[in-house]
A protein has these predicted regions:
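Active-site phosphate/pyrophosphate-binding segments
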Residues: 83-186
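C-terminal hydrophobic structural anchor segments
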Residues: 188-230
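Short helix-loop-beta junction
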Residues: 1, 147-158, 212-219
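Glycine-rich phosphate-binding loops that contact phosphosugars or nucleotide phosphates
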Residues: 1-104, 197-198, 208-213
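Short glycine/serine/threonine-rich phosphate/pyrophosphate-binding segments
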Residues: 23-29, 138-143, 203-204
Length: 259
């Protein structure tokens, strides 16, 4: 990725910057270039960070965070845009409440029978996950969840559009009912399709044939579903559920938690 501004950015534009303390010098240079061209700049970054200190000026508005979490930064930016009339209404308190509910359902204190994140982690223990989200935000969540699965297991995990997953599902290794589950060297890892479902109508057309294809090729399907609240709340809950599952997967596989 590049931090360079597009050539067309000028005095009539608003530049939005979400950053942690990574690439501070490059991000600061980009902000300075936007200000030099006369653009207004809104920056979401940790309070007291080098970016926050160097971005001070009349042409910039800094929304400080207390964490480097991407979702928290996005919520602050969306709330700020909503307050100045440049975006839909966002209720961070409702998002926080929804995430609290997911944390309770997926809590370590919940048994496997009542904890969907633990159940998903067990299902993926010896599998190669494909992650699909049909809506724009569910697809975004699927990419982050797949990344978390890769880090947790050290194995491939792919997030892609339905059309791109077709060939992967068709080429998936068939399940052998006589395979030795304890044969670490001879066993072929099978594929599981993880569907992130936010109950948006725009994903129904792609979802049905994708699930039918998975069934024909003996690819198991696991669903993370959330249908309450607005689009942002649903996105946050799908993501949090997936990240809980990735954490339990890492614990179950004995992976290095500091990685």
């Amino acid at each position: 990725p590049t931090h360079a501004l597009p050539a067309w950015v000028g005095a009539l534009d608003l530049v939005l910057v979400l950053t942690d303390q990574t690439y501070a010098a490059e991000v600061s240079a980009t902000i300075a270039e936007a200000v030099r061209r006369g653009a207004r700049v809104i920056v979401v970054c940790p309070a007291g960070s080098p970016v926050a200190e160097q971005a001070q000026g009349r042409g910039t508005t800094i929304l400080a965070t207390q964490t480097g979490d991407q979702l928290a930064g996005a919520m602050i930016m969306l709330d700020g845009l909503s307050r100045i009339g440049l975006g839909p209404e966002v209720r961070p308190d409702r998002v926080a409440q929804a995430l609290d509910e997911i944390s309770q359902v997926c809590s370590p204190h919940q048994s496997v029978a009542s904890n969907p994140a633990k159940d998903l982690a067990i299902a993926l223990a010896d599998e190669l996950p494909l992650v699909w989200g049909g809506s724009v935000l569910a697809a975004r969540a699927s990419r982050r969840v797949a990344e978390a699965f890769r880090e947790a297991s050290g194995r491939p995990a792919l997030a892609a559009d339905a059309a791109d997953l077709v060939a992967v599902i068709q080429a998936a290794a068939p399940r052998d009912p006589f395979a030795d589950p304890f044969d670490e060297f001879g066993a072929v890892r099978c594929t599981t399709l993880v569907v992130l479902d936010d109950h948006r109508d725009d994903q129904a057309m792609a979802r049905t044939p994708l699930l039918a294809l998975a069934e024909r090729h003996d690819v198991r399907v696991r669903t993370i579903s959330h249908d309450q609240g607005n689009d942002i709340e649903r996105y946050a809950c799908l993501l949090q559920h997936g990240l809980f599952a990735a954490t339990y997967l890492r614990l179950g596989l004995g992976s290095n938690l500091t990685r």
